[in-house]
Amino acid sequence: MNVIEKIERQIKDNIILIYMKGTPQSPSCGFSAQAVQALSICGEKFAYVDILENLDIRKELPRYANWPTFPQLWIKGELIGGCSIILEMLENGELKKIISNAVLNSK
């Protein structure tokens, strides 16, 4: 499996997936920490990929997603965006709504 296939599999296999620096318990950058906190507030489980431990994904994902920075939030196979978008969506209530709908529709 090449790196693009690995990325596609991760995105397909996880309803809510964040590509981040570090882990949810120990984020390695402020943006990843803020994004994880926003996701945690929404109250649903999410998967993560630590790009610091997966350098091939760190290199290829920005090209694949056409999004240059991390973290990257994917919900039901769709790129939502990075930290600023996640925080904006949390503030206006859209993040909880989109996450709840994704989880409900997957059952």
Curated annotation (Swiss-Prot):
Record InterPro entries: Glutaredoxin, GRX_PICOT-like, Monothiol_GRX, Monothiol_GRX-rel, Thioredoxin-like_sf
Binding site for glutathione: K21, R58, F70, C83, S84
Keywords for the protein's UniProt record, in alphabetical order: 2Fe-2S, Cytoplasm, Iron, Iron-sulfur, Metal-binding, Redox-active center
Compartment(s) of residence: Cytoplasm
GO cellular-component term (any): cytoplasm
Any one Gene Ontology molecular-function term assigned to this protein's record: 2 iron, 2 sulfur cluster binding
Residue span(s) of domain Glutaredoxin: 4-106
Main location: cytoplasm
Binding site for [2Fe-2S] cluster: C29
CDD domains: GRX_PICOT_like (cd03028)
Pfam families named among the record's database cross-references: Glutaredoxin (PF00462)
Subunit field text: Homodimer.
Function: Monothiol glutaredoxin involved in the biogenesis of iron-sulfur clusters.
NCBIfam families attached to this UniProt entry: Grx4 family monothiol glutaredoxin
Family: Belongs to the glutaredoxin family. Monothiol subfamily.
Protein name stated in the entry: Glutaredoxin 4
Organism: Buchnera aphidicola subsp. Schizaphis graminum (strain Sg)
Gene: grxD
